[in-house]
């Protein structure tokens, strides 16, 4: 069996997320599987590294699929890009060891979140950022971010769909940056619970607006109560930026 690794970019604005939900659904996984299956002449499943939600984008999503026949990488890339919609792009195709698994072999995932932080709206970024029209206190947000770095039980930063055996995850870095009207948040970790990144961003927004004290973050982590964070950041501002194996 031959195993192929795909690197994928997509604009998630019109899709129902990564994960296939049915035979004819509007998901990124479904669209790619349909084209690959047509190419190889049999139904083929792809495995994605991150099951991004509806409206979430990817700069470097990674997936893999297996094929009985030997495929030529550059021909696979050309075929997929020819028949996929233009808001999904295959940037690289690479044959890998048959034990490679995009989800289970990932070691570090990095997400980027974009907040448009001006009083006026940005019509060109409305599907690609979250608009916060009150000035955020970035200094306070940076202080709050420090409390989230490290290994913690992130139950308070998940939702009811997160039914993992362990809610402990390690955040390697969490940066808050200002640039040309935007506040951007970059977070790297060994894995994330469902909605964890959007809840982290939501908490930092609450801190930036003065609705939550930076010093309250450790107590929120300790309490493990999901209702402590009221703001779930919009999907539109979230990007899967990078995956390391």
Swiss-Prot record:
Keywords: Isomerase, tRNA processing. It catalyses: uridine(38/39/40) in tRNA = pseudouridine(38/39/40) in tRNA. Transmembrane segments: none annotated. InterPro entries: PsdUridine_synth_cat_dom_sf, PsdUridine_synth_TruA, PsdUridine_synth_TruA_a/b_dom, PsdUridine_synth_TruA_C, TruA/RsuA/RluB/E/F_N. The keyword Translocase does not apply. GO terms for molecular function: RNA binding; tRNA pseudouridine(38-40) synthase activity. The active site is at 53 (nucleophile). Its EC number is 5.4.99.12. Substrate binds at residue 111. GO terms for biological process: tRNA pseudouridine synthesis. The keyword Isomerase applies. Belongs to the tRNA pseudouridine synthase TruA family. Formation of pseudouridine at positions 38, 39 and 40 in the anticodon stem and loop of transfer RNAs. Homodimer. This is tRNA pseudouridine synthase A 2. It comes from Bacillus thuringiensis subsp. konkukian (strain 97-27). The gene is truA2.
């Amino acid at each position: 069996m031959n195993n192929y690794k795909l690197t994928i970019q997509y604009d998630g604005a019109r899709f129902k997320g990564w994960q296939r939900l049915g035979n004819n659904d509007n998901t990124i996984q479904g669209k790619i599987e349909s084209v690959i299956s047509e190419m190889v002449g049999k139904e083929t499943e792809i495995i994605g590294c991150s099951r991004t939600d509806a409206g979430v984008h990817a700069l470097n999503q990674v997936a893999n699929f297996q094929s009985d026949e030997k495929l030529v990488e550059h021909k696979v890339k050309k075929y997929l890009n020819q028949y996929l919609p233009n808001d999904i792009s295959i940037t690289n195709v690479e044959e890998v060891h048959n034990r490679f698994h995009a989800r289970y072999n990932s070691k570090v995932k990095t997400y980027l979140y974009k907040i448009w932080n001006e009083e006026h709206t940005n019509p060109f970024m409305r599907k690609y950022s979250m608009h916060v029209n009150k000035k955020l206190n970035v200094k306070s947000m940076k202080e709050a971010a420090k409390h989230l770095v490290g290994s913690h039980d992130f139950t308070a930063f998940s939702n009811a769909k997160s039914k993992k055996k362990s809610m402990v995850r390690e955040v390697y870095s969490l940066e808050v940056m200002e640039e040309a009207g935007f506040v951007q948040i970059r977070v790297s970790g060994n894995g994330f619970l469902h909605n964890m990144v959007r809840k982290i961003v939501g908490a930092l927004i609450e801190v930036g607006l003065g609705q939550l004290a930076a010093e309250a973050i450790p107590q929120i982590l300790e309490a493990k109560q999901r209702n402590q964070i009221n703001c779930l950041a919009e999907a539109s501002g979230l990007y899967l930026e990078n995956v390391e194996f």
